[in-house]
Structure formats: structure tokens, C-alpha cells
């Protein structure tokens, strides 16, 4: 059996793809893979913050099109890059074991948010990260920082930024336990990550039931529960990348804990929801966040 797998061509994308394919291989050793590299809008446009590009799914649209057109069987993504609704005919069908979902302050000096010097230049092109940083440290400067993980880290090493806010997962996947820079991990109560961060996801055609079954067997159970809760949150909260909303689920034993947050106008709000149904937990967290977003609280 041979599967054609569509993915982006960055080093991190390839590592994530290999990680998910190894899980599939573990349950179906005879399977073979052919990798199809796809360029996306997000790869091509590097001179604008993501929220200014004005295209939904800038890191996933072209990759998923390869599956819809029959050019590939599986599309592999960082789950955080997928919009709340996929194109008709496509379904989410598989999830990797989760890397740490948190964001971190990345710097050469080992700064935490509280120890950043007044007026420090902090890089991020994420509205969510920028608004939370401004709410916590209104005395620092926040400016856009685009590029792959290596590019952003190199700009910090070169002294162009005092620090950046980046995903722990991407750094650990690229460098393992010894990155070339210091990380101060941010608890989700301080800066909640985007839904899906740290999980690699597979998208397939809805009609390919045999492949859906295979990917379900290959999926990490804990990550699957967390993904279900976070996707429900994303769908119910009804906000895109231009709104500073984050949320992360933690599946433990028979319960799911959800921590979500919203930041705007120099203020941040955090909610915590616990339950045994991941869909309901994600929906309840979204309802609480919408009260702040819509000005009801």
C-alpha cells in the first residue's frame, strides 16, 4: 500500500510529517509513503504579518487542495494552522502525540516577561501574542517578526530583537532539548496558546473511510481528546487570527481541563472549564470567552 502525502516543504513541516507517518507505520508496517511538497500563500508572502494577508488558511489551503484534487491521499498540517471549518469533502482524521503546546519568551538573556527591560523590542506577528504581551508589559515595544523558526531565532541571536514570543513545540521539534537560545515557558494562565498548537494533524477525503479508520488507529488518544475540545472551542468562539484569543485543553484521566483567554485594549481575561465531555468543555470555554469579547462582562 502506498500513500501520497502532501505537506509544506519547510524543515519543521518535514519533521512533523515524519512524526505522524511514523505513527501510521507503527500500526500498518507494510505501508509506503510518497511525499508531495506544496507551496502555500503563507510560505510565499513573508513581508506582512499573518493577519494582514487577508486569506483564510494561508498555511493549509493549497495543501488540502492537493487532496481534494486527488493529487495526494493525505495532507499533513500543524493543527493550529487549520481553520475551524474545512473545505467540503475533507475531514480531520489523525493526530500525532502532542509536543508541549505552550508559548515561550525566547531570548539570549533568558528573559521572562517580568524581567524584560523597559522599552525592549519583542518580536511576534501574532495578534494574540502581541495583545497579551501589551496587557502584561505595556512598557515594551512589540513589532512584527515573520519567518520560519530558524529565521526568527537568528534575528534574536543577531540582536535585532531583545526577545520573541514563539511556540515551544516548533523549537523542540527542530532542536530537541538543546536549542541555541533560551526559553522561558509561558503558562496558559499567562498567555494561552492557539488551539491545536503542538499537534500534527492529517486531513483526508471524507469518502476514504478505510483511510479514516487507519488514521484513527494511529492517532494518539490524549491528543485526540484535546484536539476535539480545542476544535470545538475554535468553532464556537467564532474568531479568526485578527482577534487575540487562545485556548488549550488538558486531558487527564477521565476529565478535560480547558484554559482560555482573550486580550484587548491593554487588558486580558482568563477562564478555566473542567468536564468529562471534550466537546461540551470546548463549547463552554468559548461561551465564557465570548462574554468578554462581546462586552458582556
Curated annotation (Swiss-Prot):
InterPro entries registered for this protein in UniProt: HemC, Porphobilin_deaminase_cofac_BS, Porphobilin_deaminase_N, Porphobilinogen_deaminase_C, Porphobilinogen_deaminase_C_sf
Coiled coil stretches, renumbered: none
Broad enzyme group: transferase
Highest taxon of the lineage: Archaea
GO biological process: protoporphyrinogen IX biosynthetic process
Record PTM S-(dipyrrolylmethanemethyl)cysteine, positions in chain: 241
Cofactor, how bound (note): Binds 1 dipyrromethane group covalently.
Reactions mediated catalytically: 4 porphobilinogen + H2O = hydroxymethylbilane + 4 NH4(+)
SUPFAM superfamilies: Periplasmic binding protein-like II, Porphobilinogen deaminase (hydroxymethylbilane synthase), C-terminal domain
Pathways per UniProt: Porphyrin-containing compound metabolism; protoporphyrin-IX biosynthesis; coproporphyrinogen-III from 5-aminolevulinate: step 2/4
CDD domains hit by this protein: PBP2_HemC_archaea (cd13644)
PANTHER family for this protein: PORPHOBILINOGEN DEAMINASE
Miscellaneous remark of the record: The porphobilinogen subunits are added to the dipyrromethane group.
Protein's recorded name: Probable porphobilinogen deaminase
Name of the coding gene: hemC
